Structures are given as structure tokens and as C-alpha cells.
Amino acid sequence: MFNLLLVVVGGGIGAGIRHLTNMGALRLVGPNYPWGTMAINIVGSFAMGLFIAILARRGGSNEVRLFVATGIFGGFTTFSAFSLDFATLWERGATLPAFGYALASVIGAIIALFLGLWLARSLP
């Protein structure tokens, strides 16, 4: 139960940071392109890689990993978790599965979003 609390609290922090980042991007560059989301995905993926490498080198508790990686970075962007999964497959030498995962994840998510839109719009 404590591990779940770590993820929930970290996720709330990450989501708050994501919201503030999006609001800042809207003020800076306007709403014509999703700059905030793109920045969040790139920065979150970089931060996830940095954190995981430091954690692996210096060691760290499962609780710290859950709070920071799963919670904060997961709340900030799930794209960072996706990027870490891709990198893990790649570093294991599973190049084809890594690219299959990336392709299926991106295309599958976009198709699922459009299906959700279609379903919601077709309801009375």
C-alpha cells in the first residue's frame, strides 16, 4: 500500500508540473502547435534516462524508483515510460521488437484515440 501511495503522490506532482509546462508554452508560443506536449515528451524522456542511469550506477531503493520514475515522470509524461521500454528492448539486443513496439504503440494509440472519438460522437 505504501508503494501505491508513493506512485500516487509522485504522479500528482508530475501532472502538476506537466500542467504548468503546458500553460507556460501556451503563453510563450500560442496554441497553434503542441509545443508544450512535445517539450514535455522530450524533457521527460531525457530526465527518465538520466534518472535511471544514475539509479543504476549509484544504487537506489525501489521506493525512490517508484516515486520518481513511475510517479513523477509517469505523471509528467507516459512517453518517458514508453521511451524507457524501447531503450530496454534495444539495449537487450532486441532491435526488431523495439521498433515493433514503437510502431505498434504510436499507431495503436492514434487509432485508439480516433476510435474513442468516433464512439463518443456516435452515442446519442
Swiss-Prot record:
Organism domain of life: Bacteria
Keyword line: Cell inner membrane, Cell membrane, Ion channel, Ion transport, Membrane, Metal-binding, Sodium, Transmembrane, Transmembrane helix, Transport
Coiled coil: none
Metal-binding as UniProt keyword: yes
Transmembrane regions: 1-21, 35-55, 66-86, 99-119
NCBIfam families, alphabetized: crcB, PRK14195.1
Protein name: Fluoride-specific ion channel FluC
Organism: Mesorhizobium japonicum (strain LMG 29417 / CECT 9101 / MAFF 303099)
Phylogenetic placement of the source organism: Bacteria, Pseudomonadati, Pseudomonadota, Alphaproteobacteria, Hyphomicrobiales
